[in-house]
Each structure stands twice: as C-alpha cells, then as structure tokens.
Amino acid sequence: MIRTMVYHRKKIWVVFLICIMLLLGLVGRLWYLMNVRAEYYSKKAEDLHERERDIKAARGKILDIRGNILADNRTVCTVSVIHSQIKDPEKVIRVLSGALSVKEEEIRKKVEKISSIERIQTNVEKSIGDRIREYDLEGVKVDEDYRRYYPYGSLASKVLGFTGGDNQGIIGLEVKYDEILKGEPGKILTVTDARGVEIDGTGERRKEPVSGNTLRTSLDVNIQEYVQQAAGKVMEEKQAERVSILLMNPQNGEIYACVNVPEFDLNDPFTLNTEETAAEGEKKQDLLNRMWRNPCLNDTYEPGSTFKIITMAAGLEEGVVSTEDRFFCPGYKVVEDRRIHCAKRTGHGAQSFVEGAQNSCNPVFIEVGLRLGSDRYYKYFKQFGLLKKTGIDLQGEAGTIMHNPKNMGEVELATVSFGQSFQITPIQLATTVSGIINGGNRITPHFGISVESADGTKVRTLEYPVESGIVSGETSRTVRTILETVVSEGSGKNAGIQGFSIGGKTATSQTLPRGSGRYISSFLGFAPAEDPKVLALCIIYTPQGMYYGGIIAAPVVRSIFENVLPYLGIKRTVTETPSGENRADGVD
C-alpha cells in the first residue's frame, strides 16, 4: 500500500516538473517573440492591415538628335474597386457604367467579387477619371497612370516600336532600351481594419515612383519625314510591294533615317494597315507580326550588283585587279558548263575595269571573283564582317545566308561575285560598304546616342565597337573614285546632282524563283564621294513596269540628297556634273 502511494507520488512529481518545464518554455518563447522578434512580427502585423497599390513610373522619352520628342507619355487613369469598402454598390455600378461606357452586368461582376482590389478599367482618359473622382464613391479608387504616346504617328514606326498594356516595350527601341526607359514604380500603402476597410485618419504612405531615363537617338525627324515621303511616293508610282530606305553616317554608324513603307500607326499598333482588316485569331497575329517587321534588319535579300562593291574592294585589296586592267564582254561568261549572262545580252565589248563598274558588267566581276578564288573570296567575306551580324541596337537582326566554303565551286563563286545566290540584310550591306568607303573601319550601325535623366542631364554617352583595317586607305580611295564615276559617267547617272560629288552603285536582282518576273531594284549612294558623310540605300521590292535600279531607285536617292545634303551642311564642290538623263541600255 505504502509502496503504491510512493509510486503515485513520484508520477505526480514527474508530471508537475514536465508542466513547469513547458510553462517555462512558453514564457521563454513569449519573451523571445516580444523582445528579440518584436520588430519582425510588428512588421508582419502591419502587412496584414496594409493594402498596397502600385504607382506606375513615367516612362522615359525617346528623342531625335535635335531634341524633338518621338515617344512621350499621356496621363491616364486606372479605375479599381475595393469590395469591403463599398457602401452603395448600386450607385457605384451605375456611375462607373455610365462614365466608362461599360455594361452594368460587367461592372456588377467586378463590384460583387470578393477580393482585396478589383481593376475595372485601365487607360481611362484623365478627364473621365477626374469626373469619377467628383462622385467621391466609397470603395472606388482612381489612380493616375501613363499611356505611351507617339506625336508623329507612323513616323519610324518599325524603329521606335511600341509598348504593351503594362507599358513595357514590345518591339523596336522601346524593347531594346526598356531597362533605361521604364523607371521604378512607386507604392501607395493604406491601413485597414480586420475587414479590409481603410481606417479613417490614418492617411496613406507613399513611395514615389522614379521616372525612366530619356533616350536620345540619331534619328532626325526632318530627314525621316522627307525620306518616308519619298519612299511612299515611289511605292505608289511603281505599285511596289514595299520600299525600304536607309540613311546613315558611314563614318560612325549613326542612322539618320530608317524607312519601311508601308509603316503603321504607333498609337494604334494592333490595327492592320492592309486590306485584310477583318482577319482574326492566328491569321491576324501573323499579319501583325509581318506589319511590325523591320525589313532593313529582319529580312534578307539578294543584293544584286550593289554587292559588286565588295568584289571590287576584295580584288583591289588582294591585287588581282587594277583600274587599268582590260576586259572583254560578249554578253556572257562561261563558267564550268554554265553560261552566265550580262545584263546587256549583246555585250559591252572591250572595256577597262572602271568602265566595267560603270556598266555594271557581270562578266568583269565574275572574272575578278575567279581571280580571287573561293578561299580568298571567303577570306574577304569574313574580313569585311559579312559572316557576323552588324550589332545594330534593335532586336531580331537576321544573319547572312551564304554558301558553305566546302561547297563553293566556281559557279557559286561567279554568282556571288555579282550579288546573287546568297542573301544578306540591307543594314549589313550598308554597314559593309560604309567600312569600305570610310577608310577601312567597320562601324556598328546604331540609333542610340545618349541616355539623359528626366531633367535633361546627360547620364552617359552610348558607345559602339569599331573594327579598323578591313581594307587599306588606298583601296578605300580607289573604290570611292570608281563609284564616283559610276554616277558621273555610268549606270548611276540618275543619282547625279549639280555641284555635288556622289558615288554609288545600281542593282537589279530577280526574286526566287527565277523567271517569276519579280524584281528587286536598288541603289546605294554616298556623298561627298571624296569624304562620305551620308550613305543611302534605297530598295524597291517588286516594282511594276520598268524595274532597273538605275532608272527607278537612283532618282529616289537623288531627290533625298537634294534636300538632305544642304540640310546637313554639305556644300557643293563640283562645277560640272552629269545631266541626269535616264540610261536604260543595259543598266542595273
């Protein structure tokens, strides 16, 4: 009996000690939470009773080289409702439905939805947002927001790009420089009770947004507008599929204008600019993607005779041809078992290398290519930078489509030498020729010039790589001299302007499949010929009627230069120039 009582007493003591230990543990834990972790749990408690709303940052502007605003912001509003704070739901539904022109049923679904905050509509005009505020509706929040606005509409649309509903860049410079432009959003913090209702008198805490930086570009509104008008005019006159024109500084790669007509309205980028406006679903998205493409860098094409500039430079640099070399053109050249024709089927007869360039004679350049051989030609293809992308500051640049060197026989070499059987982008051609005529420096084409703060203070200057020595200074001078005679005496006469020395090269190439009757007409020109400050490349896709580049593309560049050269401060230095009469006999 006594033993049993002692045994139970021990059990009681054990239980008592366990309870004491648990109590001490709880007290210790409580002390730890109230002292050591007090700040942490205080913050957690605040978070439970704070509602957070974003304040969007103003996106940075995009400027042209002279400070004209190409992309800006308009103040709009975002209208939201907080279910727990609404005291008169019917009034809220009625007012919002009328002000926002939205059916009451749609508003009701969102008003009656139990959630911390429900967005009713974004991109609401500020005047409408202000009108809703005047009703002072409990549970309705009207926050200011920003919507991207493009003052010049369709100008440089495929360069600038546009933003989506979240104000983030989708294409063009808007997406390339998104990190620079987007800024940092702010916050609005309000205190609520356990039901989620804001507590009167507590006010709100704000973390102000930081506006995005401004991007200054090399584009010039005046040049871009004129070039876009010239492109639209020739597209209409020749009933062409599309027209692309590049205008850049061959010395440093700054792009003055980049036009691809038809362009699209940047303020309404999801509306098609074609006749298929009723397209829906995947078909519409495909058409939109095509509308947004920038053919100057997203698409490749056979450059045709403008590529003879590259063959010319390689041949002169390697020493396999000189300006005094003589050639004979019977209207074709036989390579292996293939007869490859000249543009002039009756032939140019005896001519010098310079005259061959003036006449854009295929057999002459085939001969230069064969003298080089596939290994050396491929070496220069690589040396000139044609096997790598230009590095332009836009997304989606396409690469060169070229023969594998192991499969490059004499026939392939012959056709490549005058710009066929491979494909490059227009920006690649313009960049490569720039490097050849500027003294041998492979520059990087670009639009971005500098980053500035919202108040206009320069943050940094954007820099781009330059690769020197792709050709010698002597070769560069010789190429410029030859190409000046192409305009003053040869197939590029229609680009000549009284008083200006202009160099250039015409081109006319067939689209695939051969024999389809579809052509690409182009002209590449630069001025002044002795010290180039501006280079232009005009490409007309599928023109109707006369399709020679020297007849339809060269005059476009002439009209652009007539306005742009004086605008850029380039003076007339030549006393005599070609008459500019049309040359249709065997020209490219």
Give residue spans per PLM region.
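Beta-lactam-recognizing serine transpeptidase/beta-lactamase-like catalytic domain environment
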Residues: 71, 193-204, 245, 250-306, ...
